[in-house]
């Protein structure tokens, strides 16, 4: 007898950007995926396309490693993701914190291996951050200070430092 293989479904189409309040405010690229974040209706959610595509957000059941990824940053405060910046990890900056989006292991990000960890609780302003070498320069959300976010191997993560030591900008 020949039986149907129902262990994997065909790709299921998904479009989270269809209507008022659903358009992303931050877009970037990371590990061959286009990343969207910061909608009005889902301010702490991120969507990553299928590997190697610009807008394909389809997924299968059970999930495959190249499927689209959708998740929400669970934080103590609800803040819209303002900026996405690709470094060694994907950095998501909100008005109250800086988040590191990475894999739970050292492999690529997949639907089953995505992890989000806070790096600091300073927050970024509306001005577009600048990547210089392997650091991010950004305006703080409060106080008018310019800050640097860079990896520190002793801390095992990204730390932020104030570059406006003498006067705010």
How would you describe each model-predicted region?
Residues 2-9, 60-70:
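Acidic/polar, low-complexity linker and loop regions
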Residues 12-13, 68-71, 115:
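Short, flexible loop segments at the rims of nucleotide/cofactor-binding pockets, characterized by
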Residues 25-27, 33, 41, 72-169:
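Beta-sheet-dominated scaffold domains
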Residues 2-5, 32, 39:
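Generic structural motif
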């Amino acid at each position: 007898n020949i039986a149907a293989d129902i262990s994997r479904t065909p790709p299921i189409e998904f479009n989270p950007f269809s209507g008022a309040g659903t358009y992303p405010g931050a877009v970037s690229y990371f590990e061959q995926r286009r990343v969207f974040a910061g909608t009005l209706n889902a301010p702490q959610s991120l969507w990553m396309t299928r590997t190697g595509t610009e807008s394909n957000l389809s997924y299968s059941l059970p999930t495959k490693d190249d499927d689209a990824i959708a998740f929400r940053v669970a934080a103590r405060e609800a803040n819209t993701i303002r900026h996405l910046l690709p470094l060694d990890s994907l950095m998501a900056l909100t008005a109250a914190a800086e988040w590191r989006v990475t894999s739970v292991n050292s492999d690529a990000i997949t639907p089953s291996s995505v992890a989000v960890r806070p790096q600091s609780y300073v927050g970024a302003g509306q001005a577009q951050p600048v990547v210089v070498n392997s650091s991010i320069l950004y305006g703080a959300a409060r106080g008018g200070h310019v800050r640097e976010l860079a990896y520190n191997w002793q801390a095992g993560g990204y730390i932020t430092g104030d570059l406006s030591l003498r006067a705010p900008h």
